[in-house]
């Protein structure tokens, strides 16, 4: 039973709340039974698993938690054990710095069977806020670098693109979204094959990046599941 604040396992958890240590050690920390269960169900084994009242004094575990309500379980995992690879649809994110939005987009990618590619400048998907927003999807969704995503690149822009439902696509698709404040820079847009916009009827200037990405993924999934929509989307 861990009963000292100076215990090395507790010190490790504290360190891993800092991105610099996560990057240096190649580890991440999850808080709460739901996230730990998501890791287990995905076949990702913990390096350390601390359980309040079983192998650590509850008050000490609470002290190293970032949550307002202390979790019963805190786990440490290897980043290298997270899924990698490609899927037919990839959500490529350019400098999406808000961890809540990033985690939500990873969760949406999980729901619609997509992968996620991240540029430099994105929030850390293994940070505490992003992990909570992803609801454990981080253990199921393959991640890649922004330039590693393969397929026809479609930039999702607020205005001026082809209406998303009218876009003609076939094969692998990379849906490219920009940062919350600045969107996509010209050099990224220049590397895209198409520009698409989500039709809006209301006066809102634009959609939140997590909402826009989710709608884009839904539209692509809808086409993939509908034979008639799939036929109409193929290029002649």
Give, region by region, the residue ranges found by the protein language model.
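Glycine- and other small-residue-rich loops at beta-strand/loop junctions that grip anionic moieties
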Residues: 2, 28, 94-95, 119-120, ...
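N-terminal positively charged helical leader segments and presequences
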Residues: 1-69, 73, 228-236
